[in-house]
Amino acid sequence: MPREDRATWKSNYFLKIIQLLDDYPKCFIVGADNVGSKQMQQIRMSLRGKAVVLMGKNTMMRKAIRGHLENNPALEKLLPHIRGNVGFVFTKEDLTEIRDMLLANKVPAAARAGAIAPCEVTVPAQNTGLGPEKTSFFQALGITTKISRGTIEILSDVQLIKTGDKVGASEATLLNMLNISPFSFGLIIQQVFDNGSIYNPEVLDITEQALHSRFLEGVRNVASVCLQIGYPTVASVPHSIINGYKRVLALSVETEYTFPLTEKVKAFLADPSAFAAAAPAAAATTAAPAAAAAPAKAEAKEESEESDEDMGFGLFD
């Protein structure tokens, strides 16, 4: 009987993962190292209605995906990334929103001897509150200290553990004595699967504004190269036309040949004082309508106030 129950459970698991792969176009492959059952339950509750978390043995997940490749060949891209303690987070919502929800469910954790550090750990300069009898402990770790008012004071920031290092017993003891929980554990996104494409989670940090600025930078680079080699493109043609017009204008100014667009330029070059006089006149012409509009508004306001006053007093005449 237990064997049959196990077989039934496997069959149901295969059906479930295939159903999720069919129903949800997007998913995360997440690492679940150091995530306990209580934290996993909290993550599932916070994602309820927005995403579905599925964990399982790697061999079973690979077998289920391989059996479904006929219907969805794009799933083969998932297989190389199913290694280690991983699972899936399926969703139809915005991937950035789900990513942020997973990050919000990380919990701080104390350093344990033998654990692999997921991040760098630095002990800040501080008064530890520990008695002088612990001085030798700090010296063994190469931490410079002094005794201040009967307690040990760390003089400068100390990099205690590097990313990827194994936490030693002394480092773990020190961090616990200082009440420092340097690590945070949760579901870590390793890969993103989106409608048949798979990519690194860093792509989610790229905003529309960043894409727009990168695109404009690319267009400028293309235009610059095309102008240099004389190869016309959509990006370079406007600049080529303007540069050509400038050359024709310069040639016309230097020669007797004139066309309508150069007559005004030649006139200003012949008499620069006319250009100096034209600039204030143009500014005055622009400012005149605005200046005329201001008194008109003031007069209209006064008339409105007078009419309001007449209406108010006229009721009692």
Swiss-Prot record:
Subcellular localization, as worded in the UniProt entry: Nucleus; Cytoplasm
Keyword check for Ribosomal protein: yes
Acidic residues: compositionally biased ranges: 302-311
Residues bearing PTM Phosphotyrosine: 24
Primary residence: nucleus
Gene3D superfamilies, per the entry: 3.30.70.1730, 3.90.105.20
Glycyl lysine isopeptide (Lys-Gly) (interchain with G-Cter in SUMO2) crosslink site(s): 297
Matches recorded under CDD domains: Ribosomal_P0_L10e (cd05795)
Pfam families noted in UniProt: Ribosomal_60s (PF00428), Ribosomal_L10 (PF00466), RL10P_insert (PF17777)
Family: Belongs to the universal ribosomal protein uL10 family.
Assembly information from the UniProt record: P0 forms a pentameric complex by interaction with dimers of P1 and P2. Identified in a IGF2BP1-dependent mRNP granule complex containing untranslated mRNAs. Interacts with APEX1. Interacts with FMR1.
Name this polypeptide is given: Large ribosomal subunit protein uL10
Organism annotation: Mus musculus
Phylogenetic placement of the source organism: Eukaryota, Metazoa, Chordata, Craniata, Vertebrata
Gene designation: Rplp0
